[in-house]
Amino acid sequence: MLAKRIIPCLDVRDGQVVKGVQFRNHEIIGDIVPLAKRYAEEGADELVFYDITASSDGRVVDKSWVSRVAEVIDIPFCVAGGIKSLEDAAKILSFGADKISINSPALADPTLITRLADRFGVQCIVVGIDTWYDAETGKYHVNQYTGDESRTRVTQWETLDWVQEVQKRGAGEIVLNMMNQDGVRNGYDLKQLKKVREVCHVPLIASGGAGTMEHFLEAFRDADVDGALAASVFHKQIINIGELKAYLATQGVEIRIC
């Protein structure tokens, strides 16, 4: 059995790490490189960096920090934000990133997933899915351009359909960003995760809602996700990664102990 992964998420805007609630009202958390180093030392299995402004305002991620991160950590990391071409991806991977993640550009041009997978291998192609639960219809819908409140829009894709589509096109991993839960720290959306798990046959990462150690346990035990991504609880030092992993191990979760 593969070990479950604990993955801190660092949202990057203008060279600094920020965090919002339900993708809005972002506050500055700190500088990128020291935070990355701290999380690696605490025992994170992987890091994910999202340039949350890149896709919405047309820029590719400012790459100067990618190589600096690669120099100070020895765990895999993934970079997302405005990657619209093979050239964009090649540059980021050449700076030392292990994976690249695409989200809004994949919705704009789904063939990008296949072209990236063919060029670089499925193992380093992650597709992020920003999913919103519509209480009126009882359905989960994929959102696009969530880095900019004024441009965020609901797409025609229902989440379960898009999950299956990106797998067919070559996604090697899926990060499910559950927008309703983002930053509110009351638990992952287990109902949605279970539905997605049934149709997702590549590694599935839960994102949005972690507030306690028990929330991580529930995601692993009840929804069988491969990794759990979180931001607020790590940034605000509500949960220590080493202590979280020790707790999960006592609960029978297969986890890498540092």
Swiss-Prot record:
A cellular-component GO term for this protein: cytoplasm
Pathway this chain belongs to: Amino-acid biosynthesis; L-histidine biosynthesis; L-histidine from 5-phospho-alpha-D-ribose 1-diphosphate: step 5/9
NCBIfam families on file: hisF
Summary of the function given for this chain in its UniProt record: IGPS catalyzes the conversion of PRFAR and glutamine to IGP, AICAR and glutamate. The HisF subunit catalyzes the cyclization activity that produces IGP and AICAR from PRFAR using the ammonia provided by the HisH subunit.
Active-site feature positions: D11, D130
Subunit structure as annotated in this protein's UniProt entry: Heterodimer of HisH and HisF.
Top EC class for this record: lyase
Homology family: Belongs to the HisA/HisF family.
Gene3D superfamilies the record matches: Aldolase class I
Stored SUPFAM superfamilies: Ribulose-phoshate binding barrel
GO molecular function annotation: imidazoleglycerol-phosphate synthase activity; lyase activity
This protein's encoding gene: hisF
Catalysed conversion reaction: 5-[(5-phospho-1-deoxy-D-ribulos-1-ylimino)methylamino]-1-(5-phospho-beta-D-ribosyl)imidazole-4-carboxamide + L-glutamine = D-erythro-1-(imidazol-4-yl)glycerol 3-phosphate + 5-amino-1-(5-phospho-beta-D-ribosyl)imidazole-4-carboxamide + L-glutamate + H(+)
Pfam families: His_biosynth
InterPro entries associated with the record: Aldolase_TIM, His_biosynth, HisF, IGPS_HisA/HisF, RibuloseP-bd_barrel
UniProt-listed PANTHER family: IMIDAZOLE GLYCEROL PHOSPHATE SYNTHASE HISHF (PTHR21235:SF2), IMIDAZOLE GLYCEROL PHOSPHATE SYNTHASE SUBUNIT HISF/H IGP SYNTHASE SUBUNIT HISF/H (PTHR21235)
GO biological processes: L-histidine biosynthetic process
Protein name (database record): Imidazole glycerol phosphate synthase subunit HisF
Keyword hit for Cytoplasm: yes
Keywords for the protein's UniProt record, in alphabetical order: Amino-acid biosynthesis, Cytoplasm, Histidine biosynthesis, Lyase
Annotated EC: 4.3.2.10
Subcellular location: Cytoplasm
Top-level taxon of the source organism: Bacteria
